[in-house]
């Protein structure tokens, strides 16, 4: 559903932020 899609998008964004902090470009 819509809520699940939003949650997945936010989770992916959060994961990207964490990855950037762990491996700075």
From Swiss-Prot:
Give Gene Ontology CC terms.
extracellular region
Indicate whether Secreted appears among the record's keywords: yes
Q: Which InterPro entries match?
A: Frog_Litoria
Q: Output the superkingdom of the source species.
A: Eukaryota
Query: What subcellular locations does the record give?
Result: Secreted
Cite the entry's keywords alphabetically.
Answer: Amphibian defense peptide, Antibiotic, Antimicrobial, Secreted
Q: In which tissues is it expressed?
A: Expressed by the skin parotoid and/or rostral glands.
Provide the GO biological process annotations. defense response to bacterium
Q: Which family does it belong to?
A: Belongs to the frog skin active peptide (FSAP) family. Caerin subfamily.
Function recorded in the entry? Antibacterial peptide, that adopts an alpha helical conformation which can disrupt bacterial membranes. Each caerin displays a different antimicrobial specificity.
Instruction: Indicate what this protein is called per its UniProt record.
Output: Caerin-2.5
